[in-house]
């Protein structure tokens, strides 16, 4: 069913083999300068929709890997999430941007977009806009592909943001995403 591939790759295989593979980015790989953006949560009822982005270059990417930063779906306890968040904030020169939309605000905003993918694209573009304000010379942004690539490109254009954008499935394998 839905999510089976991710369950096998990120939960079952690591439990059986004791290893967690990150196919897109291997340990020690040089991290080119980029923004990584992704979202978590539902927003509509159970809790906030959080869209976050971080700037990573080779040094910051190495620091994030050393902390054990990974796809949040692989983090099994809230104490580990808090520990990672604290560690990320302590990385020298870390630059990040968050958009957190609680259920009430989510339900107010959603009718403006009439479509979850357009809403997510607005959130991703807002995070990229915040990051560009902090690191104007960053050459590219990497986002998990959650819709037709044009949806996020249109949201960036609406904010007059001209940055090279790469969208791909399983972008969470990149330490910045």
Feature names for model-found ranges:
Residues 1-35, 39-177:
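Acidic (Asp/Glu) carboxylate-rich active-site/surface patches
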């Amino acid at each position: 069913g839905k999510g089976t591939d991710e369950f096998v790759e990120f939960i079952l295989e690591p439990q059986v083999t004791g290893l967690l593979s990150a196919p897109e980015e291997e340990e020690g790989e040089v991290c080119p300068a980029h923004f990584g953006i992704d979202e978590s949560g539902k927003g509509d009822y159970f809790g906030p929709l959080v869209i976050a982005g971080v700037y990573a270059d080779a040094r910051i990417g190495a620091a994030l890997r050393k902390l054990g930063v990974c796809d949040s779906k692989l983090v099994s306890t809230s104490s580990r999430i808090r520990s990672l968040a604290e560690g990320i904030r302590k990385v020298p020169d870390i630059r990040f941007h968050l958009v957190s939309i609680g259920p009430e605000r989510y339900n107010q905003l959603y009718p403006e977009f009439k479509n979850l993918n357009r809403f997510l694209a607005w959130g991703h573009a807002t995070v990229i806009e915040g990051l560009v304000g902090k690191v104007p010379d960053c050459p590219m942004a990497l986002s998990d592909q959650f819709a037709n690539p044009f949806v996020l490109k249109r949201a960036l254009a609406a904010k007059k943001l001209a940055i090279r954008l790469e969208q791909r499935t399983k972008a969470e394998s990149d330490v910045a995403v």
